[in-house]
Swiss-Prot record:
It is an enzyme of class 2 (transferase). This is EEF1A lysine methyltransferase 1. Belongs to the class I-like SAM-binding methyltransferase superfamily. EFM5 family. PANTHER family: EEF1A LYSINE METHYLTRANSFERASE 1. The gene is EEF1AKMT1.
Amino acid sequence: MDDDDDDIPQLSSHTLAALQEFYLEQQQREGMKTSQGFNQYSVGSIEEDWQLSQFWYSDETASCLANEAIVAAGKGGRIACVSAPSVYQKLREQGGADFSVCILEYDRRFSVYGEEFIFYDYNNPLNLPEHLLPHSFDIVVADPPYLSEECLQKTAETIKYLTKGKILLCTGAIMEEQAAKHLGVKICKFIPKHSRNLANEFRCYVNYASGLD
C-alpha cells in the first residue's frame, strides 16, 4: 500500500483559519444559549444556510429596518417580512403590541415561530394561504434570495399582492433598474450591512417617504 499523502487534497492555511473561526463562533453561540438563556428571536439564533442564499443582517441594520417598518406601518399596523427573517426576528425581539407581523420564508426551520410563519416559495409567488388577503399589509419588507431579475420579478408579484402600498426592498445595488421597473421603488441613502461581509453591494429601496434617507 502506498503511504504517500501527496495526492490527498490539503486546505490552505487561510481556509483552515476561516474554518477554525467559524467553528469557534458556533461553539461560542452554543455556550451563550446554555449560559445566558436562549432568545429564540435574536438575529442569528437560527444559523445561516448559505445553500439557501441566507446572509443575516448585522444587528444594527436589522434594528434600523425593523424600526423603519414599525414607523411606516403606523399604530396597529400589519407588517409582512418576505424572505427577510432577521427583520422579523428583530421586530419580535423588540416586542410591542402596536403592530402585528408575519414571516414568509422558504426555510421551514422558521416554523418554530408558529402561526406567524408562512411557507413561501418565490417560484410560486401567489401560492399563499387564504387568510392572507390582498392588500392587507401596511408595509412589506422583502429581501429576495437571489440577485436575478426572475427572482425579483416573482417576489414582486407577492409584494404587490400583499401591500396596501408601502414597500421596503433590500437587494443588490446592481438590481436598481429592475427594482424600479417591477416595483417603482427608489434607492435610499442608508446602506444595509450583513453580519458577514458580502461581495455584492447591498442597498435599500422604497416607494414612500422613509427615514432611510
